Structure formats: C-alpha cells, structure tokens
Amino acid sequence: MLEYSIIQTRGFANVTEGGRVTGFQLLVRMPNYRGAWGSLIDGADVTVDGVPFSRDVTRWSLRGRTFSLDELRRSTDVHWDLAELATLTVPLDGGLRAGVHDVAVTIYLRSPYIPAFVLPLRFEARRECTLVSSGGQAGFRYGVSLYSFTGDMNTLMTLEDAMADIADLGATGIEILTQSTVLGYPEPTPAWIDEWQRLLETYRLAPTNICSWVDNQMWTDRDLTAAEAAAQLASDVRLAHRLGFGFIRPKFGVVSPELDPHPTWEETVLRTLDLAASLNVVICPEIHSPTPIKHPVTQNYIEFIERTGTEHFKLMIDTGIFQTAVVNDGHPGFDEDEVPPFLQPLKVPMSDLAEALPYVGFIQAKFFEIDETLTDLHIPWDGILRTLRDGGYAGWLSSEYEGRREPYRGREQVRRQHALLRSLASDL
C-alpha cells in the first residue's frame, strides 16, 4: 500500500555510484487523482533541511527507466500510474548524513484539459524522513518485530509492506507474532506458507523469532494442565520450524504482578524440549519489565538451563528492562497522569546483563521514543551495545517499538532506531 503522504517513508537513502556516494533519493507517489504521461511531468523541486535542489538537476526513475527532466518532457512511451512510485534522485557529492531530515517536495504537472494560465499544477508535501547508514554492524544482526507496526498492520500495511520496510533499512531479520501475523493460525494454508516463503526470498529476509502464547488460563473455571500447555507449545514449535524460525518466545500465563509464570511452565518446557531440539528451535522465555534480571523468575530460568544442560532453552532479553525514564506510551486502561508501579523504569544495571549474557539467545530491542536528534529518551543504547559487544554477543537485535500508536509512527520510529543503533555501533 502507498502512504497517504506524497513523500514515502521507504526509499530515502544515499546513492552510491562507482564506489562513492553521489547523491540521495526518495520515493514519491502520484499526487494527482489520475496518472500522467511522462511528457506532462514538469519536474520536482526538492528541499532538504532548508537547502533547495532545482528540478532541473533531479532525475526521475519510472518502471525501471531513468530520465532527466528534458528527457521526460520529450518522452512518448512513459506513464506514471496512480498506484506507482517514482524515484527522485538528487545529485549531492557525499550525500546526506544519517539521521532525521526535514524534506519538502513540490511536484509540477501539466494537464491539457486545464487552461494554460493555471499550469503547471503544484503539489506540495513536507515531512521528516530518516536516512539509515548502511554500515555500523559491529558484529550484530539487525531485524524488526512486526509488533512495531501494531495498528498499521492490516489497515495501512500489508505483510509485504512490512517486509519491504525492513529490507529498506538494510536489516535482514523479521520477527512475527503467531496470532497477529499468521493467517489461519494455528494451521495456515499451504497458499499462505507459499506466499510467506516468496516474500522472504523477494526481500532477502531471515525469520528470527516467532512470538507465541501458552494461554494457561484459557477458561474461567480451570487452568490448562501441563499436558495441554505442552501441546500448545509443541504446536507452535512445529509452526516455527515450518516457517523457518530458529527462536520461539512462549508467553506463559502469569500469576503475579511481577510476571511469575504459571507453575506448570517447567513441566511444559520439559515435555517440549526433545521436539525443539529435533527441529533446532530454541525456546526463549521473555525477561520483560517489571521482571528484572536479578529476580526469582529469571534466576529460575537460568537454573533450569544449568540443570538440564540444554541448548534449546535460553533467555530473551527485552531491553525495556533497562528503561531509565518514565514513559507514557498510551497503555490502555491507565490514567495519563498516573504511571502504575509495574510501568516504572527498572533501570537494570549493565553488570546484570553482562552476568546473564551466557544464557541469552535473543534480544528484543524494545524502545518507546527516539527524537529528531536520534536521542532515545528512555533506553541507554550505548551501554547496552557496549555490554553486548564486550560479552561476545553476535546475535539478533530485533526492533520492537512500543510507543504511541498513531498512523505510520511505528515505521518512522523504527527507521530512527536503526539509524541510531548503526551510528553507535560504528563507534564501538
């Protein structure tokens, strides 16, 4: 789906030719109510951070062909469809810095049925766009959880849109949620699985973690037995394997405000471990606020790992546990001016992360708000990345935006996080 804004979130990037950065590009949609022949396109003025770039130097790419403005004006077989994106490429030696930019575009179109004195028609747009650097790996693997796009998925975005966004960041991993993403869960159709595989191949993405639930309290009159809970988990482990995932996060039902899992969690996992090992799927319970690392819940998981010696049960760290400042991210059911105790920042120290790191299999890079200067207002990323690097972690950092749910906001925030993480990682 195209975004409502003429300027699209996706596609804002530097352009490299012959080993050097020669400019930048952005994607724009047709702003008129109908398409137009290329000869009727009268150019586009682009302004970035107050610096203007004339329409005379901007090159247009449509349907795999690239044109100067003069070439468009003389063209006879080029058409810009209403549902088609055009790429505007602006020459600029060295390109733009990574980060957030104020981008404005004015597109000029002629229309033969409108009197000449009115022409060209002007279509103006302005928005903040984030450019993500292609470097800054530092040994980490970057991905995105589709939870980041909650509210936009299936309303403003398709699964393919989400995958295209992830690939556009230069990220290579996708994390999904069983009951949010998988059509026909728990038994998706062969057609859905075929489409899933096609999209993975198209956008060159690797399945990372699949989030599932063990709904221990499914009914009001009784809880699941350990056997029933294990059957749920086993079903999701098989699904994870079918879809290509190496990690699965089971969210067990909880029995306390500190998120103590249902007492049957251990037997549930024990019943499923052999299956997980045979399919090479790692079960990762999530360490999520308000549960810190130095807590009986986390320590019980670690003791289980040590006792069993298994390689198929590890911790998933949600970086929200390192939150240092209060955030009102719009949790439903809570007064905006009152933050309940379980939403208060935990401020888990980096020393705790370093100590737990040998037991960690996956990092959910939770965040709430990154401003236009690429400052995260709540999560201390520099300390987190340094601790992970120093501890030898070379796994996934999977973006999980959990801020306010406004249209398209998650998409822009994820871009900001990747720009921030790459910048910090390049300095490690």
Regions found by a protein language model. Give the residues of each.
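N-terminal pre-domain/capping segments
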Residues: V132-F245, A277, T310, K314, ...
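Active-site-proximal loop/turn and secondary-structure-junction residues that shape catalytic pockets
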Residues: S148-T150, T178-S180, W213-N216, F252-S256, ...
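Short, solvent-exposed loop/turn segments at secondary-structure boundaries
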Residues: M153-M157, Y185-T189, T220-T225, L259-P263, ...
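Acidic/histidine-rich catalytic cores of soluble enzymes
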Residues: I174, I210, L273-D382
